[in-house]
């Protein structure tokens, strides 16, 4: 589509719930909506990165299914995390190799938490894609931190789980996909039978506090998940398919309310 406005896509973190992002992308492709610039945190960085280099939504779903996070040989015995982040980088290397963010066909911004300074870091576009994505996805306590240029990084979601502000001024129309549930408060839970469950709960509480204001920055904010029925680390392929479908249906349902807005912003676009 020529002479169109630029469209941005902000993707939040959420572990395997990030497959809802891929479902949204499937719907956007069917509507001939082309994304020009992407920002992603954690799972959003994974999905956004894969899409930015040309992977189709179905291929993104297959990638998630192929990653065996909790395989015994991924365990970390000498690093600060249950799992060795280098093992995840190996998965990413198959797709990205030595590609840098600047080499992507689509403009991509990825954030992580700098453990040394305690501040949010949006990586230079000359950072290797596999390293930036792994750093942004290094869930604290689960994955070991990722070192880039002498600094240690972990999950960007700690400080900014929904990075809409990063590209707000870099596009004309901003679509956001926020995997936070539509519940306004953190749902009470009493099931803490493992270290992993405690860590996940602590991060859930923290992330809940830093996403609300970002929704308002989007011209169209999609909220695929209505409850906490799905885990951050799903292992069932059937449930992964369900999450993908939830993203697709949420985008489909919300599209009618923004169709006119999109057409007005870009009269030359051929939206179905």
PLM regions and their residue ranges:
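Patatin-like phospholipase
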Residues: 1-41, 49-272
